[in-house]
Amino acid sequence: MEEGDGGLRSLVPGGPLLLVLYGLLEASGGGRALPQLSDDIPFRVNWPGTEFSLPTTGVLYKEDNYIIMTTAHKEKYKCILPLVTSGDEEEEKDYKGPNPRELLEPLFKQSSCSYRIESYWTYEVCHGKHIRQYHEEKETGQKVNIHEYYLGNMLAKNLLYEKEREAKENEKSNEIPTKNIEGQMTPYYPVGMGNGTPCSLKQNRPRSSTVMYICHPESKHEILSVAEVTTCEYEVVILTPLLCSHPKYKFRASPVNDIFCQSLPGSPFKPLTLRQLEQQEEILRVPFRRNKEEDLPSAKEERFPAIHKPIAVGSQPVLTVGTTHISKLTDDQLIKEFLSGSYCFHGGVGWWKYEFCYGKHVHQYHEDKDNGKTSVVVGTWNQEEHVEWAKKNTARAYHLQDDGTQTVRMVSHFYGNGDICDITDKPRQVTVKLKCKESDSPHAVTVYMLEPHSCQYILGVESPVICKILDTADENGLLSLPN
């Protein structure tokens, strides 16, 4: 909600300003009720004065669709409300065309597949058939090795049953499920797939997925995202133009809906209390000036908690990736704490998160309000084991500069002796790859995990902080404080 003439603003649609108005005003108007407000529909209150004409384009308005609002100071306002949903409801009511399953039928009959290529995994969605996650390893003179998981399958009889069941459900119910896509609640058509590759973390129960088809007029059935919402249960979002002819699945922008409140005779342009509130906000906007002593960072400054977020739509992230912002300690102090293992990096989105403490351990964990924290030890540090590993593997990789000099591009460390794996009956192990990350934020850290073989992991850690210590790596890739 925001005010139309540049006054009070709020980032939450339908939030503080309307709440303030509800607290200041009471409604009357011969049986009219306050509108049903939703955070999905943004509103903006305008105070246009007495000389005013309603907009003739965009959102519809009617002169008789208003509420008389009275403040605690007996100020009265006539607030004209937008007809937010009337046009859409009429279109949906008149629709007699194919149901969403029938609209998607050509996609299922074509035996077409969509792909999403990421840094390690490739995702294959063969519509109405299966979802596959795979990685190909090709070695010189040898055949291609494929590491794959099926995230869901759909047999022909299941497809027929699904078609009949969902068609009946659509006739009975008008509720369309929605998903938050880039901040907008977007309707989707779900297709369930089960019978995937057995999941060792769930007593070998099969993996399963929900494919969410959403309308996008200019798309070509692309895979927008793949997410593991719980252990071995996935959500796959597909963009398709086929649903766009159905009014309930149409892509709609969320314009700001204006509410126009005009003062009635004897009342001021705006409510007194609202004007006082605006004046208070203006005072708070005056920059707070600190003296020089306060500008200095405190030695006891607490670290900020980790903030995990998904990669923006349109990028090519790995399956599990997170970005965290670390504290504003000086770089030297931060490097010391990182190398001592007392400062740990955290990352990951979705069900599992990851903790990496240099020279100590790599943990995979999930926190739940009801069941507490579930943690899996992926690997623990043993310098002797790492040195033996480094004799057979590349622990220090170089980058050749334009002037012919070499700089360390990445170091790899081996962490073994993790928890026993149900599939292999061997301890889990992980190779940690530390890379320099160029970023505008000097304290940004990206952490991601791959599983190229069962219970054998790769943990990628990228940060500008690592840039400053890579060149200290010895022949075994071990790091130290820079001079």
UniProtKB/Swiss-Prot annotation:
Keywords: Disulfide bond, Endoplasmic reticulum, Glycoprotein, Repeat, Signal. N-glycosylated. Pfam families: PRKCSH. It comes from the Eukaryota. Disulfide bonds join C113-C126, C199-C232, C215-C244, C344-C357, C421-C455, C436-C467. It comes from Mus musculus (Mouse). Residues 1-33 form the signal peptide. Glycans are attached at N195. May form a complex with OS9, HSPA5, SYVN1, and SEL1L with which it interacts directly. Interacts (via PRKCSH 2 domain) with KREMEN2 (when glycosylated). Interacts with HSPA5. GO terms for biological process: endoplasmic reticulum unfolded protein response; ERAD pathway; negative regulation of retrograde protein transport, ER to cytosol. The keyword Cell inner membrane does not apply. Residues 111-246, 342-469 form the MRH domain. It is found in: Endoplasmic reticulum lumen. Its main location: endoplasmic reticulum. One of its GO terms (cellular component) is endoplasmic reticulum lumen. The keyword Ribosomal protein does not apply. InterPro entries: Man6P_isomerase_rcpt-bd_dom_sf, MRH_dom, OS-9-like, OS9-like_dom. SUPFAM superfamilies: Mannose 6-phosphate receptor domain (SSF50911). GO terms for molecular function: unfolded protein binding. Probable lectin that binds selectively to improperly folded lumenal proteins. May function in endoplasmic reticulum quality control and endoplasmic reticulum-associated degradation (ERAD) of both non-glycosylated proteins and glycoproteins. This is Endoplasmic reticulum lectin 1.
